[in-house]
Structure formats: structure tokens, C-alpha cells
Swiss-Prot record:
EC number(s) on file: 1.17.4.2
PANTHER family, per database record: RIBONUCLEOSIDE-DIPHOSPHATE REDUCTASE, VITAMIN B12-DEPENDENT RIBONUCLEOTIDE REDUCTASE
Alphabetic keyword roster: Cobalamin, Cobalt, Disulfide bond, DNA replication, Oxidoreductase, Redox-active center
Taxonomic source organism: Mycobacterium phage D29 (Mycobacteriophage D29)
Domain of life (superkingdom): Viruses
Protein name: Putative adenosylcobalamin-dependent ribonucleoside-triphosphate reductase
Recorded GO MF terms: cobalamin binding; nucleotide binding; ribonucleoside-diphosphate reductase activity, thioredoxin disulfide as acceptor; ribonucleoside-triphosphate reductase (thioredoxin) activity
Cofactor: adenosylcob(III)alamin
Length: 693
């Protein structure tokens, strides 16, 4: 690589321009070196310059320009942006004594482009008062509004009120304004006395669909999705009140975990209507909860809840019961076995629900963690954000197939310091500020791991038994811990409660073109699908160019607004060629793809990283052939690795239409009549969960 040359992966520049390159004041877009300069400057400015190491700025610039270190996408998008340095990708929304707090927090974080996890176990909602009021939402709008006709066509405009109604709740054109309307509606449902059961909301001030959103990117969705959301939320809460009447409760009916999950889905649908991948969620429920068996099948049975991943919370008690023979006289024993059956059969059916082990996850935590972020790599307290950065191991392999240890150690230490500085970034909610200051949690992760192993002549399946590699991981973990302790003591702040993780890194790994996270390459040949928002002019033009070039382009069937297109790109992985250049004919033996590995081998690799590297969690998707595995096979492996992994996502290939990737043969690839783009990593998270930024 010549000086100044950017080591893009085959589609890296496309992904960078679509996702992270900001528009400058003169109307042109940032180049990668300009983005790096902004990101590093913004990060260093969070802490007084006297705490910088000699040469730290120059090292950060170099390592990031060369894709040797890469902070999470939100840092790349927002770091160094004046008055908009929102650096945290994902959060967990908790539960307070006020029901609307949870939904307001979820709505705000999703509108900021973040992902939100929540635990819907009914123990968290048990102390809530009953929903007391049945209400009816009426939407009004000025007839001169650009979207007035769309509101009318969608059936959202009131036939009883208009925008001159003086008692209407006027919704301001801001995230806070939208959230205030939601809070008003929810709080009204809980009031003892309400004078007017018909709640009128005026959307005249909400900007029209398609307008640019400057701070977080994307485009405005207009008032229609907001109107639909308010109506749906009111219908859910009114149903709760009616059910209370049915059971002769004098003060209404209870909000259940599944009701709350339905409200969050309505909120997320409203947000995602504004453009591609602006909503990502994780929904969890405890295995012993009275609603869990409905929860495990809720996406399949309802055809809804497409805005979230779902996982069952298990614990030591669950594994103790599930590993023992079923006791038909013990209701907890029979339930544990039913839940394990649902987990294992769901895995080979459609990949859901996943599993999260709360007992293992809470080891070493000062306070209870209740859920993970949507991709599952960070377990969090209520209101806590995740704060991620990654080391690209593959970038430290020399031309001779050796590891540049000096620069690699430097990278681990500098990324640790980068993320600790980020904990000083502003957050919008004081509940988040409190837990962030107390925990200072960071997540230094690895990407390009499969690429690193292959480029150093090692097979992926043999890594768990490779003592050199396990020692290497422990050594790098120790470097992170030392750097965190030293820097935290200098800054007079608590040492981060946990420091190391593995994230999917789908979009991030796309830029240098290496394997994402710790996943093996998907296949030597496959179809990769990229999503584009047609509301964003640049993305629309790019997708249109793909169509003109002969690529297959169709609407995203999961985005009901019709605002997202899916482009299919036949893809050849480049790792085999790179390894062949170093090791000759052995490349085919060295490079292993996911379909050549057993579920046991995949989970063993996850367990390796969980035990030797991560004190947080490891986000990992084990893709399996549904024809080769039955539920009992999955159950056996889950039991075998219980206590070693904090969560699991086991995913059957081709389990849903428009999957991010689909394996094809070499012959199918060569038969494609279009120019293929060479690369081996998925552009989204491995489980399709992460936000676009």
C-alpha cells in the first residue's frame, strides 16, 4: 500500500459514502481522511489535552486511516460534530414507577438512530397501576400541510375535529415534541379522571415526508407514521382498560409485558418509516414468566414484531432443571423443558428466540444487568448505553504471515483510551448520565478474526485448541485492562466495570473488507443484499445505478412504508485468494466457511472468545443447515455450552426472504451476467439487528 492510499475493501468505499461520510458546509462529502480527522479530534476534545499521551493523536489518525482500529459506527458518524456528538449506538430501556418513562426513553433513543433493548418480564411491571381509561385518538392537521392528503388517504384525519380545535395537543416538530405527545397520551390513559375521552392531536407543525434530518441523518417520515403510532398505542391501552372491566376490576386492567412489547413495536414502526435501518430492538422475557410461551412464538403467530429480535432470559435454575430428566410432577421442570424445546426448535425454524443467560452475565456486575443491546454483545443496566470500538486483527498480519505485536498492543491500548474518553460525551437523559458515570462501561472488540487466523496459516475450527491463540487473547485482554486502569486513575473516575466484547461489526468490517467480528466467512460465493432508503436522494441514485447495471433490485418486504429497496449482489470472497497468495494450494484447506463447520465447532469458538477475551458478552450467530439439524441436536449443544456462553443466536440459512446473505455455488456466481463485487462479509449485523449507524 502506497502512502496516502486507502485500503478499502471491495465495497468499502460504497458503504462508507452511504453510511458515514457527512456532507460538509460547501455541499461536498467528507473523504475518509477527513472523517478520521473529525472523529479523532472530537474524541480527544472530550478530555483535557494534558491527559493525552505523546503522539497519541498521530497514532490514532494513522491506525484509523489504515483501518487497524475502528470505533463503532455512531462514533464515525457523530464524533466531532458540533452540538450533535451523540456517540452511543444502543441502550436498554428500563421501568420506573411511571409507565410512560419506559416508552418515552425508547422512542427518543430510536429517533436518535440508536438501538434499544428491553426486558418485558412481568416482574418489572407488577407494581404499575391499572390502565384506567379507554380513549379515542383524533388527528387534525392544517389543510395547507404538504402531507394533508396523505393523512386523509391513510384514514388518519378526524371526521369530528379540525386544526382550529382550541384544546388540541399541538405536536412540535422535534424528537422531544413527538415524545411529549406520546407521554401525554399514555399518562392520560392512567389518570383517575379524564374530562374528554377523545384526545385531539394536531400534527400541523410536523415537517413533511422526505425532508432532511441533519443531526442523525436520514429523512423525515412526515406526520402519517406518528398519527398511526398514537392511534395504535391508544388502542392497546384501551384494550387493557376494557379487559379490566371484563374481569370486573373497578380501576381498569393491567399492562402486561406483551402489551408493553406491542407498544414498543408501534413506536419502532413509526421510527423506521423514516428510512432504512433506523430502528433496532431486543426483546427479552424470563423463562419462568407466565407469558413466555406466547412470547417465544409471538413473531411467527402474529406476523408482527418485525422491529425486534427476541430472546428468552435463562439462568442457573433453568439449566439445572433443563439438564435433569423432566419431572412431570414439578411444574418448573416441565416448563424448563418446554422452553428449551422452543429455543432449539425455533433455532432451526427461523432463528428465534435466542437465549440470554442472566446468571452468567451478572457475574462481576456491581448492579443487576437486565438485558442486552439488540446485537447481544453488551449486557446493560436499565438506561445504560453501549460504547464500542474494534481492533481489526487482520490488519496486523505482515506480508510474511507474522503478527506485528508492537502495533497491535498499541492499538488495544489506544482504543481503550478512546472509549473511556467517550464516556464523557453528553447524553440526553439524566438516568443514563448517572449509570454512565457510575459504570464507565466500554467494549473493546475484535473484527477480522477469521481473516487473521487464515492469513497466519491457521484453521478456524482448530483455534479453540490452539494454546498460542488462547494465550494471545489473554495477553491482549490484559493490555486492555491495564490501559483502562491507568487512564481511569489519571482521570479520577471509576475503572470501567467491564471492558471487552465482540460485536458483529457488519458495516464496519465492510470498509476494510475483512471477516466481521469473530464469524467465519459465510461462503466462498454468495448473494449479498444491501438496503437503500429511497427517501435519501444519494441512496436512491446509487440503488438506481445498480438497477441500470443489471443487478436485481426489489422493494424491502419488511418495510411496510415501501421506502426501502434491496439490491442483490453476487459476491466472491477474497480471503481465499489472499491466503492462496501466501500459502499456495493449502488455501482451500486453511479457509473454512460457515457451512463447513458444525454447530459444536461454532459454539466452541464463541466459548473460546467468551472465556479468553470478553468480560462483556460475545455477539455471535451460528448459521446452520436446517436439514442437517433437528431441535434435539441444538438442545444438546446448548446444554453442553451452558455456563460458557452468555447468549446464543442459532440461525437457519434461507429462513426468511431477502436475507442479508444467501449461499450460491461457484457455477451460479460465474453465470451471473453482472459485475460481481468481491467480499466475504455481511453489510449488516450477522443477525440483522444493528442500526445503520
Amino acid at each position: 500500500m502506497t502512502e496516502g492510499e486507502i485500503p478499502w475493501g471491495p465495497t468499502g468505499e460504497l458503504v462508507y459514502n452511504r453510511t458515514y461520510s457527512r456532507v460538509k458546509p460547501d455541499g461536498t462529502r467528507e473523504t475518509w481522511p477527513e472523517t478520521v480527522e473529525r472523529v479523532v479530534s472530537g474524541n480527544l476534545a472530550l478530555v483535557d489535552s494534558r491527559y493525552q499521551l505523546p503522539g497519541e493523536r498521530e497514532d490514532l489518525l494513522r491506525l484509523m486511516r489504515e483501518f487497524k482500529i475502528l470505533p463503532a459506527g455512531r462514533h464515525l458518524w457523530a464524533s466531532g460534530v458540533k452540538n450533535a456528538q451523540h456517540l452511543f449506538n444502543c441502550w436498554v430501556s428500563g421501568w420506573t414507577e411511571k409507565p410512560s418513562d419506559h416508552f418515552e426513553f425508547t422512542f427518543m433513543r430510536l429517533m436518535e438512530g440508536g438501538g434499544v433493548g428491553a426486558n418485558y418480564s412481568n416482574r418489572f411491571l407488577a407494581d404499575y397501576p391499572h390502565v384506567k381509561q379507554e380513549l379515542e385518538v383524533h388527528i387534525v392537521c392544517d389543510e395547507d400541510h404538504d402531507d394533508y392528503a396523505d393523512l386523509a388517504e391513510a384514514g388518519q384525519l378526524s371526521s369530528r375535529y379540525d386544526s382550529d380545535w382550541v384544546d388540541a395537543f399541538v405536536i412540535e416538530d422535534s424528537r422531544e415534541g413527538w415524545a411529549a405527545a406520546l407521554v401525554d397520551l399514555i399518562d392520560t390513559h392512567y389518570r383517575d379522571d379524564v374530562a374528554h375521552k377523545e384526545r385531539v392531536y394536531d400534527v400541523s407543525r410536523v415537517r413533511a415526508a422526505g425532508r432532511k434530518l441533519k443531526t442523525f441523518g436520514g429523512t423525515a417520515s412526515g406526520p402519517v407514521p406518528l398519527a398511526k403510532m398514537l392511534t395504535e398505542v391508544s388502542e392497546i391501552l384501551s384494550r387493557c382498560a376494557r379487559e379490566g372491566e371484563q374481569y370486573r376490576f373497578e380501576d381498569g386492567g393491567a399492562l402486561t409485558g406483551l402489551d408493553a412489547m406491542e407498544i414498543d413495536h408501534a413506536i419502532a414502526q413509526c421510527v423506521v418509516a423514516g428510512g432504512v435501518r433506523r430502528s433496532a430492538r431486543m426483546a427479552m422475557m424470563h423463562w419462568a414468566d407466565w407469558q413466555v410461551e406466547t412470547f417465544t412464538n409471538i413473531k411467527q403467530d402474529s406476523g408482527s414484531h418485525w422491529t425486534t429480535n427476541i430472546s428468552v432470559e435463562v439462568d442457573d435454575a433453568f439449566w439445572s432443571l433443563a439438564k435433569a430428566p423432566v419431572d412431570p410432577l414439578n411444574p418448573r421442570s416441565t416448563k424448563a423443558h418446554r422452553v428449551l424445546k422452543a429455543l432449539s426448535e425455533g433455532a432451526v425454524r427461523n432463528g428465534e428466540p435466542g437465549m440470554w443467560d442472566s446468571s452468567l452475565s451478572n457475574v462481576g456486575e456491581p448492579n443487576e444487568v437486565v438485558c442486552t443491546n439488540p446485537c447481544g454483545e453488551i449486557t446493560l443496566e436499565p438506561w445504560e448505553p453501549c460504547n464500542l470500538g474494534h481492533i481489526n486483527l487482520a490488519a496486523f498480519v505482515t506480508d510474511a504471515g507474522k503478527t506485528d505485536y508492537i502495533d497491535l498492543i498499541r492499538a488495544h491500548r489506544l482504543m481503550t483510551r478512546f472509549l473511556i474518553r467517550a464516556t464523557f460525551s453528553a447524553v440526553a437523559d439524566p438516568k443514563s448520565r448517572e449509570v454512565l458515570d457510575r459504570n464507565r462501561r466500554i467494549g473493546v472488540g475484535h473484527l477480522g478474526v477469521a481473516s487473521y487466523l487464515a492469513l497466519t496459516g491457521r484453521r478456524y475450527s482448530q483455534a479453540p485448541g490452539d494454546k498460542r491463540f488462547t494465550a494471545f487473547l489473554r495477553e491482549m485482554a490484559a493490555e486492555v485492562d491495564r490501559a483502562a486502569e491507568e487512564f481511569s486513575h489519571e482521570l479520577r473516575i471509576p475503572v470501567p466495570v467491564k471492558k471487552r466484547t465482540v460485536a458483529p461489526t457488519g458495516t464496519i468490517a465492510k470498509m476494510p473488507g475483512v471477516s466481521e467480528g469473530i464469524h467465519p466467512i459465510f461462503s466462498r460465493y454468495f448473494i449479498r443484499r444491501i438496503r437503500f432508503s429511497v427517501l435519501d436522494n444519494d441512496q436512491f441514485l446509487t440503488a438506481s445505478q445498480y438497477a441500470a447495471d443489471g443487478y436485481h433490485v426489489e422493494k424491502d418486504q419488511y418495510d411496510k412504508s415501501g421506502n426501502t429497496w434491496v439490491v442483490e449482489i453476487p459476491t466472491k470472497d477474497t480471503l481465499v485468494e489472499a491466503v492462496a497468495a501466501r500459502f499456495g494450494r493449502d488455501a482451500e484447506d486453511i479457509v473454512e466457511s460457515a457451512n463447513e463447520l458444525t454447530l459444536h465447532q461454532l459454539l466452541a469458538f464463541q466459548a473460546l472468545y467468551q472465556t479468553c477475551w470478553a468480560d462483556n458478552a460475545v455477539s455471535f450467530t451460528a448459521n446452520v443447515d436446517p436439514d442437517a439439524y433437528e431441535g434435539v441436536d441444538v438442545a444438546a449443544d446448548l446444554q453442553r455450552f451452558s455456563g460458557l456462553i452468555k447468549g446464543s443466536t442459532i440461525f437457519p440459512e434461507e429462513s426468511f426472504p431477502q436475507a442479508p446473505y444467501e449461499r450460491i455455488t461457484k457455477q451460479q456466481y460465474e453465470a451471473a451476467a453482472i459485475k460481481a463485487v468481491a467480499d466475504g462479509v455481511d453489510e449488516e449485523c450477522a443477525n440483522g439487528a444493528c442500526p445503520i449507524k
